[in-house]
Structures are given as C-alpha cells and as structure tokens.
Amino acid sequence: MPESPEVQALAEFLAEHAVSRRIETVDLDEFRALKTRDRPLAELDGATITGIRRFGKHLDLQTDAAHLVISFGRAGWARWDGEAAPDDAPVIARMPLNGALLELTDAGDWLSLGLSVVDDPLEVAALAKLGPDPLDEAFDRAALDRAVTGRRKQLKALLQEQETLAGIGNAYSDEILHAAKLSPLAHGSALDADERERLFLAVTTTLRDAVAARRGIPPYRLKEAKVAAMRVHGRAGEACPVCADTILDHDAVASWQYCPTCEAAG
C-alpha cells in the first residue's frame, strides 16, 4: 500500500518532470477506476499540468482545466515514461504528455486505484475527511494529542485511521510503534504524557526521515526502497535491530509485525 512518504516522493518527482507538460489524452483501460462518471477524463484532453500536490496517500494532479485526484488505494501506483517495472502490474490508465508518458497501474487482486475529475480536490470525500498530516510543517504535539487522547481504540488501528492522521498505513504504523516502544494493542486513551511524546516523536521522525530517504528515487524503485528500509514490518522471524528478540507476526485482518520486547509498553 502506498503511504505518505512514497506518495510525497512521487509528487516531487512529477512536479519536476510533469508540470508544464500538456496532457494529450487519458486512455482508461478499466472504467471502474473513474469515480466521477459525470466528469469524463476527456475534460483533461489538451490541458496543461500546473502543479502536483499530495493529500495523505492521494495525489492531486492540477491542470488549467480541472483537477485529477489519484487515489492509489491498496495496490495502485504510477510509472513514468516507460520505465522498467519490478512487477507486471496491469496498466489502468495512460497519459501521453507531449514527449513523456505517465501510466497508472494496479497490482491488486481487486481494483483499488481511483480517479476523480473535480474542480476542487476536497470534492473527493476521502480527501475532505482527512485528519492532520504529520508531514505538514504545522503538525505539532498538540495535534497528536488531539488525535489520540481519550480514544478507546488500539494504536495500530488509530494510526491507520485516515480521519485521525493522514497518510499512515500498515507498514509505517508498525515502524512508528516500534520506534515509540508502544504496544500496537494499547488504546490511545491509555497513554500518559510521556508515551504521547514518544509517539509524537516517532510519527514525525519516521515519516520525515522516510521522505528524505526516498527523495530523488524514480517511481518504479520507491516500493523496493520502502521495503528495504523497514526495521520490523515484513520481518517476522528476524532479529529486532534494537534488542535482538525475534520479531513476531500478528495475522489478523491484515498481517503486521512487532517486537514483543521493545513494544511492551502502553
């Protein structure tokens, strides 16, 4: 699942390579991906890309005609100008850009990529409901406190709730809780001030360090860079890099990993 650090890196890449290019057309191979049936993709034919902005795990492609909001969902992604791809993800949409090509793919068993043509990105319900984004410069300890204080919900689920904090998914929530030394099963309401401080520092440091590490990497390599950087997520059975205990897997609705020694608090 694309999460905010990789989507931010993609946004910066496209800001450098796609802005000021003209969209020749948008060829859609899977009609279900278009979520705004009353706003066809043809509205973008001939439009010039004027900006790229990230909203949580979503991308807003701004043009002089309309906005194209790209919701990557569970397995959507982008491919630039015919670059090599590490997987055979089906291409859902193609956008020739006068001399370049932007392709949108989806590698999932079911289609999760969504495209919306709108005048304002906040017309997309998922964007309008987003909570504060830890990658925003304005995000501070008070914003984190408001997000978790009094919440009788497990931290693992709370961190992934987009209305609470924007941009965090399964992988980075594992990394954040490991860095904060907090149990994924602890409730937000159970955290004391020191634990909330640890969580705040882990959230901001983990995500911002990830953005810095992904910056400049071409889109097709961002997923493998993310996987390689994980310290606990996806590493069940390996030694914890902090305490050397064995990382365990919790296989519920979605598999997630944790260190039973480091993450015993909360």
Annotate each PLM feature.
Residues 22-40, 53, 145-266:
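Basic, nucleic-acid-binding surfaces and adjacent catalytic neighborhoods in DNA/RNA-processing proteins
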